[in-house]
Amino acid sequence: MRHVLLVDLGTGNTRVALADSAGTIWDMRTYTNSYYRDDAYEDAQYFLPAEWEERILRGCRELCEAHPEIRVSAVSSAGARQSFVLLDREGKAFYGLPNIDNRGRVFMDQVPDPEEVYRLSGKWCTEDFGAAKLLGLRQRRPELYEKISQVTSISEWIGQIFTGRTVMEPSQACESQLYDIRERRWSDKLCRAYGVDPAILPPLENAGAVLGPVLPKWREALHMAEDAVFIVGGADTQIALRQTEIRPGDIAVVSGTTSPVVTLMKEAFYDPRQRVWTDANLRGEGYQVEMNPGVTGLNYQRVRENLYGDWTYEELEAAYEQKTDFACTASFSSLLFYQRRSLRKGGFFLPSPLGAGVDRVDLIWAVLADIACSIYEQFQNLSDLTENRAPAILGCGGGFQSRALCQMLADLSGRELVLRPGFEQATVQGLIQLCDETMGEPSLHADGTAIRYTPRKEQLIHRYYPVWLENRNHANGVC
C-alpha cells in the first residue's frame, strides 16, 4: 500500500488530499482561491502564484504532520482548465491567468481566420483560452508580457514546484488554443494567429509520466519516502472522468461550478457549425467532445447561502420531495453552447401579481431545476450531433450529491443516471487511479455500490421544462 499527496486546483477553491492506493482519502485541506481585478481591462482577473503556493504547501505540511506514520511515495495534481501560470527567466511563477479572466475579449477581432483556428484547436475563437489571455496581456500589460520565459497550466505548475521541471499535459495544452489536436503538438500557425512566441511553450508530457524526483527540500520537509516522485496529472475534467469509467460512445456529466457534458471519441470530431468543443483527452489519446451550460453549481451555492443558510442540504432535499407544483422558473446558467452565445439575462420568472403562496423553497427548487434543464438541453444536443446513444448517463462531481438533481436529470433524459463510488471527489479519485497505474499498484476503486437513478414519466420536472425554456428564451431573445 502506497500513499500519495494530491492537489486539486478548482476555480473556487483548492484541495490538498492525502490518500492511499486503495482509493481511501485519509485527510484533506481546502482553501478558498483569491483573485484580484486588473483595472486596465473591463473584465480581467488574476491571481498571485506565491499566495496559492503558500497555501498548498501549508496544506501538504499539515497533512503529513497529522499522519506522521505515513511516508508519501508520490505527488500529483489536477487543475481547472483554461488557467495558466507565467514564469520568469529565473523560473519563478509571477502571475496567474485564471479561467475567469476575460482580458482578451476586446481583442478577439484581431485573430485572423477563426475557421482555421477552430479546425486546428477544436475550439472557437473566444477569450476563454490561454492564447486570448496572452494576447490581452501583451496589448495592455507589456511590462508583464515581456517578463514571460515560460507558460504552464496550473496543474503542471505544481509539478514545477516539486521538481523544478516545467511541462504541460496535452489535456491542458489544448486549453491554450495553441495546440493542434490532430497533430498532438504545439501549432506554429496558431501561435502566429495570436502573436505568441512558441519559445514560451514548454515541452509536452503525458499524464502518468514521472516528471522527476521530488526536490530534496520538499521530500525532507514533508518526510516523504526517499524515492518520492511527482506524477503528471492534467485537466480536472478529464481526470475526474476517469472515476466514471467512461468509454468511447458514453456520455458523462461533471457537475460542479460548471457542468460539462462530454462524450469520448477515438477520432477528432469536427462540426462546421462550431457547436461543440473538441478537447484532447489525457495523453492526447482520443478526444473529448463537449457542450457546457456554463455556470450552474455556483448559482445554487450562492442562492442557498443567501436564502437558506440556516438549512442543511439534507433538509432542503426533504423539502424538495414534498413539492407537487412550481410557482416560478429560474434561469441562471450562462451559456447556450450550441448557439455559441452567452446568456446575459437571468433571474426568477413569476406570474404578476406575486402570489401569496410563493416561498423560499419555490425559489431554490427552481434554481436546481434550472441546472437539470440546462444540463439536459446540452445532453440532448450533444447526443443528436455525435449520434452517441448510450443507454445511461455517467455522472460525477459534487453537484450530484443532490438526489433531487439526479432524479430530475434521469427523468428529463429518459436515461438511467449512474454514479460510481467516490463520485463526490471524482478528481481526487481519478488522480489516485493515475498514480496507481504509474506505481504498479493494483487497480482498486472506492468501496461501495454504484448509485442508479431510474427515469420516471409525468413528473413535475416534465411540466417545468417547457415553461422554463419559454421564459429563458424570451428573456434572452433566443429563437
Where are these regions (language model features)?
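N-terminal glycine/serine-rich phosphate-binding loop of ATP-dependent small-molecule kinases
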Residues: 1-96, 119, 146-147, 219-220, ...
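Active-site core segments that coordinate phosphate-bearing ligands/cofactors
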Residues: 5-6, 111-124, 135-154, 159-165, ...
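Short glycine-enriched loops at secondary-structure junctions
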Residues: 22-24, 31, 80-81, 100-103, ...
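Short, acidic/turn-prone active-site loops that include or flank metal/cofactor-
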Residues: 30-31, 36, 98-105, 173, ...
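Gly-rich Lys/Arg/Thr-decorated short loops/hinges at beta-loop-alpha junctions or inter-strand turns
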Residues: 34-43, 116-117, 167-174, 197-198, ...
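Short acidic-aromatic active-site loops that bind/stabilize oxyanions
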Residues: 42-53, 123, 127, 204-208, ...
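Short beta-strand-loop/turn "lid" adjacent to the catalytic site in phosphate-handling enzymes
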Residues: 64-99, 124-128, 155, 159-180, ...
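Structured loop/turn residues at beta-strand edges in well-structured enzyme cores
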Residues: 70, 199, 388
